[in-house]
Structure formats: C-alpha cells, structure tokens
Amino acid sequence: MNFLAHFFLAKREPAWVVGNFVADYLRNAEIAELPEAVRAGVALHRSVDAFTDRHPVVRQCAQRLFPFHGKYAPVVIDVFFDFFLIHNWERYSEEPFDVFVQKMYDILLEYREMLPQGLQERLPRMVSGGWLHSYGHIQGLEYAFLRLQSRMSKPEQLQGVIDSHHRYFDATNQDFNDFFPEVIAFASDWQVR
C-alpha cells in the first residue's frame, strides 16, 4: 500500500494518519519517542504492509509483474493500487475524494512538527503538487515512479512501468477490487483490538 491507501485505512484518526505517513521513514528508536497514538498509526501501517505482502491476490499480481520489475514488483503494485483506489473510490467511500484528500493534507499540516525533518520539508511540495490526486492519472504515476527511482539500488527495474500499467490494467484493477475489501476488514479488526 502507498500513501493514499494507508491514509484511507487510518479511518481519519489524525494521530494514526501521521503514524501511517512516518512509518517508512523512521527507525524504531525514533518511533519509540512518538506519542502513543502516533505509534499506533505506525503499527497499523506495518500490520497492513505485512497482511498485504502475504495476501494471495497481491502475490499473484506481483508474480505477473516480476518478469518486468523484479524485486520492485511489490512497490509497483503499491503505487498501482493507489491509482485503482482513486478510480474505484465511490465503491469504498461515500465521502468525495477531494474532501478526503484535503482532510489528509490538513491533518499532516497540523501535525507537521511531529514529522521528521525530511518529511517536513517534503510536505509543502506534496500538498502544492497534489501528490495524492496525482496517483489517479498516468502523468502522476510517471512522476511517482521517477521519485522512487532516485532512491532505489536498481532503478532500471522500474523502466517500462507505465507499459505494465497499460498491459495489465484490467487484471490489476480486478486484483485490487478482490483484495481491498479484505484489507479494509483487516484494518478495521486491528483497530478494535
């Protein structure tokens, strides 16, 4: 799951949204210093990632993309699934997408001081660049993958990623819609523990 799906699964609880945002950017020692509710958001993020990585539908999708993107196939799926969440939004939420996105940006801006320095610096670009909206169109996907390539040891494995998106559009959309209700149920169950 990428930013958008993690925010969706955080149920708009501000501290959990923040925890989901910082989860991949902090070491465990730094996470231990966060308020308890934010740590719960980090734990939710990590639990969702583990559930996602083990899920048979996601594994099937990764196998389909592995010949083209190697070990980065799961990363490609994370971004593709945000695309399909946007395109299937009304199936999963009664709240308009634009309203949801603005709420997420408002939460992150309100809690900006809790973010690590790098995310504090990136957040204004994320908001002004409409990153969450951008996952819903091809140009935005291209830009997201360019950002990812700059942090990868084998960036060449993301070449042709938009071709993969087009080639497997219907299959990946079906995979997303088979998987997403199950991860929603998992996250809801996790949150009531």
Label the model's feature ranges.
Residues I77-I107:
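Primarily interfacial, aromatic-capped hydrophobic alpha-helices that serve as membrane anchors
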Residues G19-N20, E94-D98, Q157-V161:
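Short coil/turn segments at secondary-structure boundaries
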Residues V101-A185, D189:
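An amphipathic alpha-helical core segment
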Residues E13, Y92-E95, G136:
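Short coil/turn linker and secondary-structure boundary residues
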Residues N28-A29, I86-E94, R151-E156:
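Short helix-capping/linker segments at secondary-structure and domain boundaries
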Residues M1-W89, S164-R193:
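An N-terminal structural lobe/cap that precedes and organizes the functional/catalytic core
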